[in-house]
Amino acid sequence: MVVGSTSTAKSDFMKPELTIVLPAYREEATIEVCLHRLVKLLDDKGISFEARVVVDGPGDQTASMVRAFPDSRVSVIELERNTGKGFAVRRGFEDCTTEFIGFIDADLDLHPEGLAIALDLLKSSGPQVGGAIGSKVHPKSNVEYPLSRRVISSFYKKFVKIGFSLDLNDTQTGLKVFRSEAIDKVLPTLKCNGFEFDLELLCKLARNGFLFIEIPVDLDYKFKSTVNIRTGIKALVSTFWLAIYLRRN
């Protein structure tokens, strides 16, 4: 267990097949609507699931709103301080007993139907396919977001292509589903707390022989992201050190 966090879970009688982790930071304005949207989509698709909202530090009423959400399949994990998306997702992955586990950004800028697409592909694939991951550059993706984000994203993708031996076009889109057995192999070794977490996770899964399927996504960008030139530079620096770490280990 991670020191410095508490969890509130509600009982459910049917063992789910999919655990969805939603890292959340100050999402009180949208979390209730997003959870209703997520639950309806998964129910309509006939997917048995549990959803874990990991609130990445105090600051608003996100946690209390999740606790009050009227569905026993939704739980909340509260972190005592803001530690980063990677730490939040790792915390949500802990003690998972479902066959599949994934994560999606809590604001649902990415349409949650991608989770159903990813799950179907994993079910129909062999065990060597460890994950199905969203890709904004997939030819069937529907993506509209600001030029500044496009520039940062394009530069970052080129940087990743140079520094890492991954045959993937997009490592950072916040919608991914994995086989839990794959996650179990690498979870104890994961170190990254920030946005570079996705890249570390994929690299370590690839080292363990797992393959990936890239899937299209629909992105409805709501213009509230904190990603800018400064955070882009910070991400590049963190990714540079991750490349060095992975080469040495």
Regions from the PLM with identified roles:
Residues 80-95, 100, 112-195, 221-238, ...:
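Acceptor/aglycone-binding surface of glycosyltransferases and processive sugar-polymer synthases
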Residues 49-52, 63-95:
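Conserved donor nucleotide-binding strand/loop of the catalytic core
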Residues 2-40, 47:
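N-proximal low-complexity "stem/linker" segments adjacent to membrane-targeting elements
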Residues 16-19, 39-53, 61, 72-75:
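Short loop->beta transition adjacent to catalytic acidic/histidine clusters or analogous donor-positioning motifs
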Residues 55-63, 108:
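A conserved acidic beta->alpha catalytic loop
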Residues 1-16, 163-165, 189-249:
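Hydrophobic helical membrane-anchoring modules
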Residues 27-30, 58, 85, 111:
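Donor nucleotide-sugar binding loop of glycosyltransferases
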